[in-house]
Amino acid sequence: MNNYGTLTLGAVPIGDPKDASLNLIDYIINHKIILVENVEVFNKLCKDLNIKTDARIIDYGSHDIPDEAGIYIDMLKDGQDILILSDEGTAGIIDPGGRLMQIARQNQIKVKVMTGPNAIIAPVVLARFNRGFYFHGPTPNRDERIEYFKKLQNYELPMVFFVTRAYIEDFIIDANNYFGPDRRVFVCSNLTKQNEFTTFTTLKDISQFVISGDINFSITLVIDGKPPY
């Protein structure tokens, strides 16, 4: 049994600050080291929650492990606990923390996850497809995306994609070509925020939204699997 510290993957609200758990608030207040994806976003969260922390705040700032990973591992081996937070949702899934978590486990360091808001589960629940799902996350460049779509054409489970504003039009065009215009899709953005957007429709109709300019923000798409199920 070692005396290493614990790496905790935190879960922050995906929109509404009131979704913050008591556990999250307690961890922010009492942790001495907190790795964050963006300091400004973290400071705003603390302001919204009306809390203060004396923790050392480190801007992780990357979706991959930074060169300083060894420093964090040394901190943990020295018995210091570290909390890592993404800007929204649970850290570690297509977010800061995933690679660090792997390295921590390789070094026999305890890793725990905080339950709470999740940017993947909420869209899946709202999509109402009521089955398992395939999570892809951010879409790759166009050539790689087409190869993915070819492999997923006959997949029967719903598929979850994160699409940034800059690539929405190309994504929807490719999705129509490879999944078909009549494939059902749930689209959402800014869940739990005042400007929340949700719609349950088809890929063909989503194309019209994009062409008309009604969708000009980053979105999450849950594309239904190939029928019959």
Where are these regions (language model features)?
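Short active-site oxyanion
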Residues: 28-34, 108-111, 158-159
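Class I SAM-dependent methyltransferase SAM-binding "motif I" and its flanking Rossmann-like core
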Residues: 99-155
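Glycine/small-residue-rich loop that forms an oxyanion/phosphate-binding "nest" at active or ligand-binding sites
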Residues: 68-114, 118
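Alpha-helix capping/helix-boundary segments
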Residues: 40-42, 89-90, 119, 167, ...
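A contiguous loop/helix-start segment that scaffolds small-molecule binding in enzyme catalytic cores
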Residues: 2-7, 77-81, 158-229
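Conserved helicase motor
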Residues: 59-65, 139-141
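Glycine-rich, flexible N-terminal cofactor/catalytic loop recognition
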Residues: 1-61
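Short acidic active-site motifs
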Residues: 23, 67-72, 144-148
